[in-house]
Design a protein with these regions (language model features):
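Residue-level micro-sites within transmembrane alpha helices that shape
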Residues: 9-10, 268
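N-terminal secretory signal peptides that target proteins for export/translocation
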Residues: 1-9
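Phosphate/dinucleotide-binding and metal-coordinating scaffold of catalytic cores
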Residues: 24-482, 492-510, 514-546, 556-560
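Bacterial N-terminal signal peptides
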Residues: 11-22
């Protein structure tokens, strides 16, 4: 590891506090993963070859499954298993159950993420299950494994990770990230007793509007009682009373490591910043909750203010406080000091720029043409700048108060029929204001649900700030100066002339947002989604200056 800069007075005080905390930390706050026979399945130097075979009708049905907007706030899974034959590195397995996976950003009908469940006899390398993520938001194929690497170094239970090339019915779907499935075999790697309660959070938190986003993987009734008890403890107005109630149910010291590590790797779409993509395990030995990362394919990327559904965090890079547990703990002065100390400790022990950059180079060479150079450069830039940015914030001390999260549920309701046309050119996303009237929008609702601009423009291109997604944006300036944006995110495999793309559920849609430009930077307010319709691409010339034209129609679902 590179030697850290010579510490100033503030850093020296943090170091002393860290040492003092180490002596009294809970026994389970620093996890080390046990060696396991299945480690061969996660050899980082080996790209697995996974070939899936199932009937064409089953494959068509599987790839099109997904959540509807009506059940976005539901904890019920929209996916079902199909029977397949799976070959992994030449080892063939019959009667394997396969299903689609994903909640929001990773959903794809062209390259769906997959879960494989093998029969009673163990699968390849002794695995019972395989989880294959499509890296829909990460064309570098780096972010997930790097995040879990740092989490593991921070003493946080984290899945093992490597890569796989996946084909279905002979069609090469490209490189996927292969991670541990979150079940008892994984829990045994870190916990003496794997029979406790396991929870998954997808837009889930310990507050009434978000409690339905926490799925219980074990005994539903008993687990719900525990969640209600933790919710009650977090609602106590007195800080001391709140902290005692939380400490009886959560290993706070272990949570500090998880919390700080999420900010360290820029996991804006995790628990602390977006109440999303997390697991937690209630250890039967002490009845306390331990948090674990999940779905970090948007980490190691520039953090933009208000990035993510429901995210209200300011520009701080060193701490996230949207999650209710994070927000309430941050109110306590002693916890803030411990958090600062823990973050500095992780910078000194778990954040090794040379090793991380070497890992980026190794994986990039291993995967070759399957990685996107622009996305790799983003990851490298994040690694090089994180320490200085975070230590600058720690040096001045974190503010005593941050913006409190809004507890309105992220649910959507159909309120308007919307249609429109666009005729623009490619590679024009840098435009920030109306320059031509290259689009038209009709918004039918009674009463009106938005203040519609009088004129619209359209831009199109590949957005590096959206993981190099192909986007078309229809935008108009209101008299107030705010900009209304309908932003279509399009699967690159479908971006071609003559394509008729269904807008349905959370796979293909347009985000409807309001932008307010301020001296400190743009403020983004999500309004809802345009879906349940169709996007028609008449002409697609995806080169700089090429023509992009078409039309759209659908239903606007308002976020409430």
């Amino acid at each position: 590891m590179l030697a850290p800069p010579t510490p100033g007075t503030h850093r020296f005080a943090l170091a002393l506090l860290t040492l003092g905390l180490t002596a009294c930390a809970a026994d389970r706050s620093d996890f080390t993963r046990a060696a396991d026979p299945t480690d061969a399945a996660f050899d980082p130097d080996h790209v697995l070859q996974v070939d899936v075979e199932l009937t064409d009708p089953d494959w068509a049905e599987l790839r099109d499954q997904g959540r509807t907007l009506a059940d976005l706030c539901s904890s019920e899974s929209p996916y079902e298993y199909f029977t397949a034959t799976v070959t992994v590195d030449g080892m063939r397995f019959e009667n394997v159950e396969v299903r689609k996976k994903g909640f929001f950003g990773s959903l794809s009908s062209a390259r769906p993420s997959l879960k494989l469940r093998f029969a009673e006899d163990l699968g390849p390398y002794g695995l019972e299950r395989m989880t294959l993520n499509n890296d829909n938001q990460d064309p570098s194929h780096l972010r997930t494994c790097l995040t879990y690497r740092v989490m593991d170094a921070a003493g946080v239970p984290a899945p093992r990770c490597n890569h796989a090339r996946v084909s279905v019915n002979g069609e090469d779907l490209g490189v996927f990230t292969h991670v541990d499935s979150m079940n008892k075999p994984f829990l045994r790697l870190y916990f003496e007793d794997p029979d406790g309660a396991l929870f998954e959070g997808q837009l889930g938190d310990f507050t009434a509007p978000y409690l339905g986003g926490i799925q219980s993987k074990t005994e539903e009734q008993l687990d719900r009682e525990f969640l209600a008890d933790l919710q009650e403890a977090l609602e106590r107005p007195d800080q001391g009373d709140m902290l005692r109630g939380v400490s009886a149910r959560v290993d706070v010291d272990a949570f500090l490591s998880f919390w700080a590590a999420e900010a360290l790797v820029g996991q804006w779409d995790g628990y602390s910043n977006n109440r999303n993509n997390w697991f937690a395990y209630r250890d039967p030995i002490n009845s306390k909750l331990y948090f674990m990362p999940w779905g970090p394919d948007a980490a190691f990327a520039p953090l933009r203010q208000n990035q993510g559904l429901g995210s209200i965090n300011g520009p701080l890079r060193s701490v996230f406080t949207t999650g209710r547990l994070s927000a309430r703990l941050f109110e306590v002065p002693s916890i803030r000091r411990r958090y600062e100390a823990r973050m500095q400790h992780l910078l000194d022990t778990a954040w090794d720029e040379d090793a991380l950059l070497a890992e980026v180079a190794r994986v990039t060479a291993l995967l070759g043409a399957d990685v996107a150079p622009e996305s790799v450069a983003q990851v490298q830039d994040y690694i090089r700048t994180a320490r200085a940015d975070i230590e600058a914030e720690l040096e001045g001390g974190l503010p005593a108060q941050l913006a409190r999260p809004v507890d309105a549920p992220i649910c959507l309701f159909a309120v308007a029929n919307v249609s429109g046309t666009f005729d623009t050119t490619f590679d024009t996303l840098d435009l920030t204001a109306i320059t031509e009237e290259r689009a038209a929008v009709t918004w039918a609702s009674d009463p009106p649900t938005v203040n519609l601009p009088q004129a619209f423009d359209a831009v199109a291109g590949v957005d590096p700030e959206l993981m190099n997604a192909t986007t078309i944006r229809v935008l108009g300036v209101r008299p107030s100066g705010q900009v209304l944006v309908l932003g279509f995110v399009i699967d690159p495999a479908l971006f071609e002339s003559g394509a008729i793309i269904p807008l349905g559920g959370l796979t293909n849609f347009a985000a409807v947002v309001e932008l307010t430009f301020r001296p400190t930077g743009p403020l983004l307010r999500p309004l809802g989604l345009l879906t349940d319709g169709v996007l028609t691409l008449d002409v697609v010339e995806p080169v700089s200056g090429g023509r992009i034209s078409g039309s759209f129609s659908g239903v606007f679902y308002e976020q409430r």
